[in-house]
Amino acid sequence: MTESLVGERRAPQFRARLSGPAGPPSVRVGMAVVWLSVIVLLPLAAIVWQAAGGGWRAFWLAVSSHAAMESFRVTLTISTAVTVINLVFGLLIAWVLVRDDFAGKRIVDAIIDLPFALPTIVAGLVMLALYGNNSPVGLHFQHTATGVGVALAFVTLPFVVRAVQPVLLEIDRETEEAAASLGANGAKIFTSVVLPSLTPALLSGAGLAFSRAIGEFGSVVLIGGAVPGKTEVSSQWIRTLIENDDRTGAAAISVVLLSISFIVLLILRVVGARAAKREEMAA
């Protein structure tokens, strides 16, 4: 009987813990939906509404103009190249931070997050000071696609590192040791044991990095210089349209960038989920 009374006393406490600080699940879901709508969905709906304000013909003329198409080409080309490069070096940095011990490791780990905290216009100023016409290191990337690429690499690198790092920490080292005991070399162990486990994280980091890159403005505006067909990315073309009081055209370009980001993220998420499922079945 005593145990029954204790159980009755504990039951409300257990239910309280399940309900959480924001009340029952229905309340939490409602709060989440409202906040998501206010912060994300309504602004997206507003930009789509503005883009459609001039009709389909005006939308098509805005996104298919020569200047717009050139900005898309420059943006997608450089962003894709930067994403691939950051996949390689982001994985390398994450590996070093997880698997290797060296002096200053914590400092390096903290520096990785610096592009998150640094205002992007400050990042652009840093790029200009280091790689501009008066470069102290003799590298002159101002008004070049290389300069835009370096700036984008700077602001997108953390997405890959931080996506891969926690997964790498959770990988079972015993599986790697077992493969080594069977005669597998380092490259074979990495490609057959480690890489499959990292694939979902790599795809997630790549998607976030690419999406950030195609919409970046502050870090490229100074070093790139908005040279049409060479360094003018879509975000800079949007600014030009706004300065010319063509907000409908600017909204149309924005919708295209948003659509590209959404499609890329969706595809990579589906591929990553399938890769994770195959990894679970293989295990």
Pin down the residues of each PLM region.
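C-terminal transmembrane helix and the adjacent membrane-cytosol boundary/short C-terminal tail
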Residues: 3-5, 9-12, 27-31, 104, ...
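Periplasmic/extracellular loop-to-transmembrane helix junction in inner-membrane transport proteins
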Residues: 12-26, 47-84, 96-100, 240-248
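Transmembrane alpha-helices
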Residues: 30-35, 84, 114, 118, ...
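Interhelical loop and adjacent transmembrane-helix boundary motif
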Residues: 64-66, 220-267
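Hydrophobic alpha-helical transmembrane segments of multipass integral membrane proteins
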Residues: 38, 73, 77-89, 93, ...
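Transmembrane-helix boundary motif in ABC transporter permease subunits
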Residues: 20, 57-59, 81-112, 125, ...
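Short hydrophobic faces within alpha-helices
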Residues: 72, 97, 114, 174-182, ...
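Membrane-interfacial helix termini and adjacent extracytoplasmic/periplasmic loops
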Residues: 11-20, 56-64, 69, 99, ...
